[in-house]
Amino acid sequence: MAGNSIGQHFRVTTFGESHGIALGCIVDGCPPGLEITEADLQTDLDRRRPGTSRYTTQRREPDEVKILSGVFEGKTTGTSIGLLIENTDQRSKDYSDIKDKFRPGHADYTYHQKYGIRDYRGGGRSSARETAMRVAAGAIAKKYLKDEFGVEIRAYLSQMGDVSIDKVDWDEIENNAFFCPDADKVEAFDQLIRDLKKEGDSIGAKIQVVATNVPVGLGEPVFDRLDADIAHALMSINAVKGVEIGDGFDVVNQKGSQHRDPLSPQGFGSNHAGGILGGISTGQDIVANIALKPTSSITVPGDTITKEGEPTQLITKGRHDPCVGIRAVPIAEAMLAIVVMDHLLRHRGQNHGVTTETPKI
């Protein structure tokens, strides 16, 4: 299987399956001298970890990360960083019924047709369990970006079903299980999840992820535009079906005089572009939104077929999230951090000495 790596200068390769012995990743290209410990990575892993609230899957994994290589006396050495998380709460018996059936809305059918074999236990490699390693690798990128350049990457749940936030209070996000920046909407989110659990159903969600203090100049036109790589990274997250940069699809209804971001000596007058023009960062906040589909792992019966092509019905067993968007918040942060980190190192390698007479606004 190809496609297990992302990035060029800062390169992350993951491995492992949902019900395998362990998950792991290799991080190449991290500069030497970055102070990093397992505790630094654990903070974000705990935010993504399953079984931490009644709103998410009750699979209880400690997700304790181990640094196997690339760090000596608390600092990165510049060599490959090896990370490992053991799986401890697999319950493979929950999936015995789908050994010869394809779950509708999942990757079972496509994996089987592509490879001729699939690990049906929890979805195997296609499971969002794999994203634990992305979060661990992303935590390294987030720390380097913040320590060395003051870049901060944060995300929040902006919509679940038909419930949307009305305001953004960054200090509120970590005060509730939904990563919701609007305290007035937490109760509505809570009730929505309660209703879904009674129905045995699920719901979609929208997340906004923002990078602040990003230097101007990041991005490699034409095929490695910064926004193209961000979209690629965010679309690679399980269940993501749409990505917007800046105003996204709202630009369809905008006129050029409205959408363009005017420049002045004091800075940009707006940020409809989401901090990227011509595939290159403007120095403004990078703003992206992702839409996540409702998971198909529900107890509502669904039509499907067997491996032999016979019609049948399936009720998904196991422990699943009624809304995968909740735990996707730290995953979105990680993927944006990995891309920004990669492009920062690429820019530094080629354009480190470039200067202009134009002041940076």
Swiss-Prot record:
UniProt-listed Enzyme Commission number(s): 4.2.3.5
Taxonomic superkingdom: Bacteria
Entry GO CC: cytosol
GO MF annotation list: chorismate synthase activity; FMN binding
CDD domains assigned to the protein according to its UniProt record, in alphabetical order: Chorismate_synthase
Stated family: Belongs to the chorismate synthase family.
Name assigned to this protein: Chorismate synthase
Native source organism of the sequence: Vibrio parahaemolyticus serotype O3:K6 (strain RIMD 2210633)
Lineage, broadest ranks: Bacteria, Pseudomonadati, Pseudomonadota, Gammaproteobacteria, Vibrionales
